[in-house]
């Protein structure tokens, strides 16, 4: 997948870049696997802002993705590779031998006409899903379950993956790009390969309007607000805030760990991810 850049004929196009979508084979989704979802624009049930900086995105249909891959030992043929506006990775429409259609996350390198399968006896091949305990060490996987039968939760975004690092009893050690090592039960499903669209992080938004299409509204700095609106607000002239960075509600930010220390899943984290000291 290549990156397309533009001549600076306008200020907006000077830094803008887009994917060339050369791998995409279908422009319209498969209608029986789409839904219309209500967009809340960051508002709660009372109509008040619950999450700031959201609203005004373009309309889109939700594609129903099969994250569980529990239709075992039935081969399926890849019919198309499609763009999904609801996620950064591409999706594939597959047709099982019994005639059922399904959407799955497209792994990098998959093509129309390829055959994929799920189940414990499946071949170690890109796009096949199986219990993570059946996958040999050193293999890259995506769409990894954390709870048996719940569906994939780890490595679902564009270009993401985890690597099988070893075994500890009935648990498999999964190493993530963040350097975190986590234990996953051997019966949890995972899909072979790296998630598609690995050039996604190279795309430059380029202009404010494109962010608005995605539903992202402008973010105002706290130091330019009044004291009633933000802890960093107020002061005569331009100030630096006068205190360590905090959120509008006073919680420390920029380096402050916000993960709850009593989460039950903490016992499955063997090695914590490294913190970037340069940020």
UniProtKB/Swiss-Prot annotation:
MF-aspect GO terms: RNA binding; rRNA binding; structural constituent of ribosome; transferase activity
UniProt keyword annotations, A-Z: Ribonucleoprotein, Ribosomal protein, RNA-binding, rRNA-binding
Keyword rRNA-binding attributed: yes
Gene Ontology terms describing biological process: cytoplasmic translation
Disordered: annotated segments: 216-279
InterPro entries: NA-bd_OB-fold, Rib_uL2_dom2, Ribosomal_uL2, Ribosomal_uL2_bac/org-type, Ribosomal_uL2_C, Ribosomal_uL2_CS, Ribosomal_uL2_dom3, Ribosomal_uL2_RNA-bd_dom
Gene Ontology cellular component annotations, sorted alphabetically: large ribosomal subunit
Gene3D superfamilies, per database record: 2.30.30.30, Nucleic acid-binding proteins, Ribosomal protein L2, domain 3
Subunit-level organization: Part of the 50S ribosomal subunit. Forms a bridge to the 30S subunit in the 70S ribosome.
HAMAP family on file: Ribosomal_uL2_B
Protein family per UniProt: Belongs to the universal ribosomal protein uL2 family.
Role noted for this protein: One of the primary rRNA binding proteins. Required for association of the 30S and 50S subunits to form the 70S ribosome, for tRNA binding and peptide bond formation. It has been suggested to have peptidyltransferase activity; this is somewhat controversial. Makes several contacts with the 16S rRNA in the 70S ribosome.
Protein name: Large ribosomal subunit protein uL2
Organism whose genome encodes this protein: Leptospira interrogans serogroup Icterohaemorrhagiae serovar Lai (strain 56601)
Gene name per UniProt: rplB
